[in-house]
Amino acid sequence: DRPSTAGSQTIERFEGPAWRSPVLDGPADPAFALLRGQMAHRLLQVLPNLAEEARADAARSYVARCAPAWPAAEREKLIEEVDAVLRVPAFAPIFAPASRAEVAIAGTVELDGRRLPVNGLIDRLAVEADRVLLVDYKTNRPVPQDGTAIPEAHRRQMALYAALLAPLFPDRRIEAALLYTEGPVLHRLDPEALSLKPAA
């Protein structure tokens, strides 16, 4: 089912680090990048559930509460980045009404004769008639030129998630992708990338 917003057109503030100023602390400050990434994730979690005409006001109100010291231009840059993601027609299945946000996943997978515990959070999960699509957001990161430039740690993360989901959906193919918000660019991982292999 679609997550409920209980009739509200607002976004609740998350419990995160104290706000940081990009003027005083600088955009390269780790706390600034962390807060920006958390806000982007929260906006991508909630905004798809709101009517399009309500998204901008809800986003501005939320970002202003979470980052009151940010210049207006910096806040708008974040909001526009998220809005650009939601407006890409090719991304529509990711944010379809039946998709789910922030899906907790836990279990064990077998790798190289060992059973490894896996505990994570899938940013977006879309279950369709013939496939299951899991998407992880990457914020504040350079966009890889192509799939071969994706860090191995990110590939491995998605491979572990895919391995946990496969037994739950035996009649559907499992697909995974990384969504870089600064593009926005969606890099789909090929089946080879989702195969679990011992670390080199």
Language-model segments: residues:
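Structural signature of nuclease core domains in nucleic-acid processing machines
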Residues: D1-A200
